[in-house]
């Protein structure tokens, strides 16, 4: 019979020593034997554990570098490029949720900054073009005034008829300069944050009808046809009546000024139960497709030739006035012929109700007969 006893275990560093006491009973023969077993296999196992641990640390470091440090370096590089004014850089990496969220927000921010920078550059170019065009518009009538005034001062014009005509030309050119200054002042006033809105709930259709009636005689004289499409219901909306009146007046005045005789004009008001749509259309000379987006900017003209008597501020003025009241403003061109300007305002619990247009019956009949 063999009996084994574990006496003690000693750990020194990575070496374990186990002492066994063996008691053998074989017949009459008794002997005791101590066996000291040095666990070399435990040392080898511990060394293997250390190698595996070191390899795991290395692999984890590489994984961490790829999943965390790598994206952070890309974010840092993108921020540096954005700081230098390069907004075309976009982040694109695979990472954990938090870094992916940072990537999405960063790309959105860069896209917004890129758009803002493009608009800023476009505005700077527009200002430079506006200054050049403004100097041209001032220079032409002022030069004419100086020439006629100098001729009168030097006594070159002897005929009373010519003197009268020269004075009339000076007066007409001064009116153009005054109109230009007035338009510039109006644009500056509309850009001012201190401009009082003076909004009230008014009849959108009624104001449009009054404008159409005011221009009806001029339309007849120029053989223009006017189609007025206003619903028989009264729609109450938020508006500044003076700004709306002047904006529509600018649009109709531009239509008369820049289109040939026989042009058909339509002024329509549509209630979609969600928004009010005001549209001014004509089938006149139209505008080029490339000017569709910039036609509301100052000094942008459809004919690109600054030979007319207008100031070039016709469309920006009504757009700025209507921006105080409308949700959106746009223009459309149909094959370069039909041109329309659309303005819409969202309704705010203002349900339309009936309005008898007694004054408009005769006007509707006259407009439809043309």
From Swiss-Prot:
Domain spans labelled Histidine kinase: 133-355
Top-level taxon: Bacteria
Reactions catalysed according to its record: ATP + protein L-histidine = ADP + protein N-phospho-L-histidine
PROSITE patterns on file: HAMP (PS50885), HIS_KIN (PS50109)
TM regions (residue ranges): 2-22, 40-60
SUPFAM superfamilies, alphabetized: ATPase domain of HSP90 chaperone/DNA topoisomerase II/histidine kinase (SSF55874), HAMP domain-like (SSF158472), Homodimeric domain of signal transducing histidine kinase (SSF47384)
Keyword Transmembrane helix belongs to the record: yes
Signal peptide annotation: none
Keywords: ATP-binding, Cell membrane, Kinase, Membrane, Nucleotide-binding, Phosphoprotein, Transferase, Transmembrane, Transmembrane helix, Two-component regulatory system
Biological process according to GO: cellular response to phosphate starvation
Role: Member of the two-component regulatory system GtcS/GtcR which may act in the control of the transcription of the grs operon which encodes the multienzymes involved in the biosynthesis of the peptide antibiotic gramicidin S. Probably activates GtcR by phosphorylation.
Protein name, as recorded: Sensor protein GtcS
Lineage, top ranks: Bacteria, Bacillati, Bacillota, Bacilli, Bacillales
